[in-house]
Amino acid sequence: MIIGIGSDLCNIERIQKSLDRFGERFVVRVFTDVERAKAERRVLTRAATYAKRFAAKEAFSKAVGTGFRAGVFMKDIGVANLPSGAPTLVLTGGAKARLDALTPPGHAVDVHLTMTDDHPWAQAFVILYARPL
């Protein structure tokens, strides 16, 4: 059963302005080490890479129904890739706690994430699916 759906649209140019204005302070506060390493390897699409991940964090916060309140912080939501290359979320801290609280007894949650960009927009969708154990 679906227990949460979230989507977000992020302006890549807005992320570029944050990178220009706040630099390392912005990326360290918002993104995980894995996310930063991936974005920094992509010199030509650095801002778009960050924007997609920013949108994924926002989409997850909507899927769990809290936004960035109730102990859910951006850095607790990390985008990583499965061996197949498909994106997924790695959750820690308040983000993991909130998802655990939403998970019905006797179920596990699969997090489905898709991201895309077409300048100047980056978009992400998150579906939280509870499956019986």
Swiss-Prot record:
UniProtKB keywords: Cytoplasm, Fatty acid biosynthesis, Fatty acid metabolism, Lipid biosynthesis, Lipid metabolism, Magnesium, Metal-binding, Transferase
Its localization reads:
Cytoplasm
**Top-rank taxon, per record:** Bacteria
* CC terms in the record's Gene Ontology section: cytoplasm
GO molecular function annotations of the record? holo-[acyl-carrier-protein] synthase activity; magnesium ion binding
Show which residues constitute the signal peptide: none
**Cited InterPro entries:** 4-PPantetheinyl_Trfase_dom (IPR008278), 4-PPantetheinyl_Trfase_dom_sf (IPR037143), ACPS (IPR002582), Ppantetheine-prot_Trfase_dom (IPR004568)
Xref: SUPFAM superfamilies: 4'-phosphopantetheinyl transferase (SSF56214)
Identify this protein by name: Holo-[acyl-carrier-protein] synthase
Q: Which organism is it from?
A: Rhizorhabdus wittichii (strain DSM 6014 / CCUG 31198 / JCM 15750 / NBRC 105917 / EY 4224 / RW1) (Sphingomonas wittichii)
